Amino acid sequence: MAMKIARVEPGSEAEVLGLGPGDELLSVDENELNDSLDYDFYTDSKSFHLKARVADGIREWDVQRTERGPFGCDFQTYLGDQKHSCSNHCMFCFIDQLPPGMRESLYFKDDDERLSFLFGNYITMTNMQDHEIDRIIKMHISPINISVHTTNPQLRVRMLANKRGGEVLKYLPRLVEGGIAVNCQLVLCRGINDGDELRRTLSDLLELTPMVQSIAAVPCGVTDYREKPFKQTPYDAKTSAEVIDIMEEFGDECKRRHGKRIIYPSDEWYLKAGRPIPPEEFYEDFDQLENGVGMMRLYASEFLAELEKPHRIYGTKKMDVVTGEMASPLIHQMMAELHRQYPMVEVTVHTIKNKFFGGNVGVAGLVTATDIIAQCEGKLTSGTLGVPAVMLREEKDTFLDDITTDQLAQRLGVKVEVLPTSGGDEARALLRSGLHIARRRRA
C-alpha cells in the first residue's frame, strides 16, 4: 500500500527531505502504510527509516529528528486501501431501506474501525480479526464507536444475520482491558432486543465501565422500502416510555455507582412517548450527540442563550424555514420566542412530512428537496427559505435526493439560506441584518 501526498507543510521535515505533492510514502521502519493512522503512529518518533516513491523512483532516508511530532505530510485520502465494507444483513439496516435511484455512494455500507476513530462511524466488528484488535490496542486508537445492539450472542447473530455476530463480542473486553475507550450504540427493534434483553445488555456493558464511556439507544427506523422478511413494528408512546424507564433506571444506578450516567435514550424516545426532553445536566458531556442524544436540549439552550444578547436588526425581516416532523414542535417554540423578543423578525415554520421514505421517518436530516418542493411550492411567505445544514450531504449543497440548494431555489423562486446546526449559530443567522440595536422585548 502507499499513501499519496496531497500537500507538504512548508518548513516541515518532510519538505526538507524534498517530498512533495504526488509522492507516495510506502513504509516507515519497514511497516507498510495502509492509512493515515499508520503514518501518524510510525512517524511519531525521533528517528525512523522512510521509504517513498518519488518522480525519479524509489528513495529511502534515515530520518533523525530533534523531537517527536507531526512530520509534515497531508494525504489525498485518509485510507491507502479500500474502505472495509459491511458483511452484515441487519434486520434494521436503514441503507437497505433506501429508495431506488439514489446516488451510488449512499448504498455503500462501511464497517471500518479506522473510520470509527477518524470520523465517529459505528462498527459491528464482524469483519475484524485478532490482528486488527491488536493494532487498535498497540496504536491506542481510542475511542472506538461500536454498534452493540445486544450482548446476547445468539440474538446478535440473528439481528446482524452474520454468524460472527456473537463471536466478536469477545473483542469488547479485550479493547477495554487494552485501555481503549468505547462508545456503544443500541438500535432497538420492538419486541426483539428491548425489554429483558435490553436489561441484559445494559448490565453486561456496565461491567466494562469506565472504559465504556457512553451507551445510547435509538429506535429502529422503518421506511416503505423494506424488502427483508423481518417485520418491524414502529414504537408507540407506551413502548417508547418502557424503553425510557429501563434506560433511566440503569443510568440512575450508574450515576450512583460511578458518578456519571453514561446511559442515554435518544431524543426520539421522549418525543414518541410524549415526555419532555430532560434538562441539560442529564446529558453530562453530550457524548452521543451524533446519535440524536440531547441534540434538542442543546439546540434549545444555545438558541435561547443567544436571544438574551442584543443584535443589530436592519428593519424588519421575514423568512421561511423547513424542518422535519420530529423537531417541528421545538422549532415552532423557538421561532415564537424569537418573534416575542424581536418582533421585527418573523419566521414561518414549514413541517415537512417525509413522503420520500414513506412517512415513518421524522428526523430533519433525512428530509429531501423533493418533499420540500411538493409541500412548500406556492406556500412560502417570504423571499428566503432557511434550510438546516443537517439536511445536506457532505458537499453542503446537495440533498439526499441529489437536488442542490441552487436547484431548490430556482424551483421555488426564492433565495435558499443554509442554517447552521447549532442553536446559537442558527439564532445569529436568523437575526443577521440591522440598522440599529434591537433590544429584546422583556416579559
Segments (PLM) and residue ranges:
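Flexible glycine/acidic-rich beta-alpha junction loops that bind and position SAM and/or redox cofactors
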Residues: 191-192, 212-239, 258-281, 353-360, ...
